[in-house]
Swiss-Prot record:
Recorded name of the encoding gene: SMP3
Cytoplasmic side: 1-10, 113-141, 203-220, 306-311, 359-370
Name of this chain's protein: GPI mannosyltransferase 4
Enzyme Commission number(s): 2.4.1.-
Lineage: Eukaryota, Fungi, Dikarya, Ascomycota, Saccharomycotina
Record-level Gene Ontology MF annotations: alpha-1,2-mannosyltransferase activity
Length: 535
């Protein structure tokens, strides 16, 4: 069934490409990890910015690796540093997101083109993938999940190629050696595991075909293992150096494995304990299937499982989807972003024939009513979610930090206190503090006490979602402070809770706080983030 029924798919595809770049330059903030597990770590090392190191990089058993960060983001940052052109942190952030758009665009389109056998299938896969809000928004953000998506796609493509060779009846094709391809496959699997420990989940079922291929081509398994081991050893040595300061202990006692820092192993051990996962939130085992998957696909679910049939159920992409969702559903901590690698694979498996009333072989010149309805719902769903998650979701935090970067930290002429309330944790690297004048503190209702470092001149206090009475006491504690005191909060929260003397010095309209919406009070739905200077 052709996609070019009631519209020209090329126009929509080209518009989607443009939207990728537009949304990459928007300021939405989806999850703290997109800052704190990437640029919060790297900019401290490369630009000497004052940052906060997340627990994954600061505990005695580090759970995140430097390897993927240096591989995917450090070349950009070092290039900026070597050129010597002074870019603001905001501009650096934009460049990183544009880089992600370009990498994701090339890898995704190339893999889908090669995964699917015919032109109509390729058009369908590319069309739905490019118009999904996950592709438009999430893939430009600096998550480890974005990198995972690219690596999963390439690995699924390699396995699919090997499967095709096994199932073909062409002796010339079966006799071809795949050593180079499998070497790089092993390397990508290694990088994928160091990037996210969840990576193998998406390859569990497809790897049955890989094992079958290895059984008949044992030398290929050796090349794949070699490709896996080389980056594994390199990244372990890199992490050991970064976290321990040297690799002297390894050189002296190479067989003492306690000297090695193996971050995926530490991550696996940490996440295997429910008490650790409870610190991040526990979810029912059905959350991915019944909550996250519908939020990701929306009307696309009907393209996937209409009439409980799908002609693609034996394909490698379908097996990767089932594998990823099933394995990740066994883990009691289930966030939506964990499933974003399945999106291009799911779109390859959309089965429009199941919702078409046309008989086999009948030429379709006009889209059936149900298809037209679902297509319009698909557009509406993805446009709304792209605007919500790509523009408004916590969209004022980074611009507000950029305001302080421009007006306080570049000049370094005055003292300041920033009290952030009812926002995601502000990533300090955006402030671009190179003079070590900043102290970052976190206060909560359960832990309201803090101690200021008198050697610092600027303070960033993350009050998180504290009760407004505690925030008022926090503000009161700075009554004798000689510098400027700022409260940064959603405009709706300020209007509801505060009538103290303050002056709004800056505001950003495209900001929405979804965590403190009170549906009994429509004022809480008012978007906007403000910076208020206390008088």
């Amino acid at each position: 069934m052709s996609l070019s029924l009631d519209f020209n798919w090329r126009y929509v595809y080209l518009i989607a490409i443009g939207l990728k770049f537009v949304l990459a330059l928007s300021n939405s903030y989806i999850h703290p990890d997109e800052h704190f597990q990437s640029f919060e770590v790297l900019t401290n090392k490369i630009f000497s910015f004052t940052t906060t190191t997340p627990w994954e990089f600061s505990s005695d058993t580090p759970a995140r690796s430097f390897g993927p960060l240096y591989l995917f983001y450090a070349p950009l940052l070092y290039s900026i540093k070597l050129v010597g052109y002074e870019l603001s942190p905001l501009q650096i952030w934009y460049m990183a997101r544009l880089q992600n758009v370009l990498i994701g665009w090339v890898i995704t389109d190339m893999c889908i083109y090669r995964l699917l056998p015919t032109k109509p299938e390729r058009i369908k896969g590319l069309f739905y993938t490019s118009t999904s809000y996950i592709t438009l928004v999430y893939q430009s953000h600096c998550f480890s999940n974005s990198i995972e998506t690219w690596l999963v796609l390439i690995c699924v493509l390699v396995i699919n190629d090997l499967r095709f060779i096994q199932e073909s009846n062409v002796p010339e094709l079966q006799s071809q050696r795949q050593y180079q391809k499998l070497f790089w496959f092993g390397a990508l699997v290694s990088i994928g595991i160091f990037n996210r420990i969840t990576f193998p989940a998406f390859l569990a079922l497809p790897s049955l075909y890989l094992m079958k291929y290895f059984r008949h081509n044992k030398m290929s398994a050796i090349f794949s293992l070699l490709g896996f081991m080389l980056p594994t050893i390199a990244i372990i040595l890199l992490d050991t150096f970064e976290f321990n300061g040297s690799i002297d202990d390894i050189l002296k006692h190479p067989l003492d494995f306690n000297s090695y820092v193996i971050t995926p192993l530490n991550n696996l051990i940490y996440n295997s304990k429910v008490e650790n996962l409870s610190n991040h939130g526990l979810h029912p085992y059905y959350t991915h299937l019944l909550v996250n998957l519908p939020q990701i696909l929306g009307p696309g679910l009907f393209f996937m499982v209409s009439n409980f049939k799908n002609q693609y159920w034996k394909t490698t992409p379908f097996l990767a989807v089932i594998s990823g969702v099933s394995v990740l559903s066994l883990i009691p901590h289930q966030e939506l972003r964990f499933l974003i690698p399945i999106v291009p694979l799911v779109c390859c498996c959309f089965d429009l024939k199941n919702i078409s009333s046309a008989s086999k072989g009948e030429r379709i010149t006009k889209a059936p009513p149900m298809v037209s309805v679902l297509m319009n719902l698909w557009y509406l769903f993805n446009i709304l979610l792209a605007v919500l998650m790509g523009v408004y979701h916590q969209g004022g935090i980074v611009p507000a930090l950029d305001y302080f970067h421009s007006n306080i930290f570049q000049e370094n002429s005055r003292q300041s206190v920033q009290i952030w309330w009812r926002t995601y944790s502000p990533p300090p690297w955006i402030l671009g503090d190179k003079l070590d004048t900043l102290q970052v503190l976190t206060v909560t209702d359960d832990s309201p006490q803090f101690e200021l470092d008198s050697s610092k001149s600027n303070y960033l206090i993350d009050a998180m979602g504290s009760d407004y009475t505690h925030v008022s006491k926090l503000i009161e504690s700075f009554k004798d402070f000689s510098g400027s005191i700022y409260l940064i909060a959603p405009i709706a929260s300020i209007r509801k809770h505060y009538d103290i003397s303050m002056h709004q010095v800056w505001n950003y309209t495209h900001h929405l706080d979804l965590d403190h919406i009170d549906f009994s009070d429509f004022q809480s739905l008012k978007p906007g983030l403000g910076i208020y200077e206390l008088l």
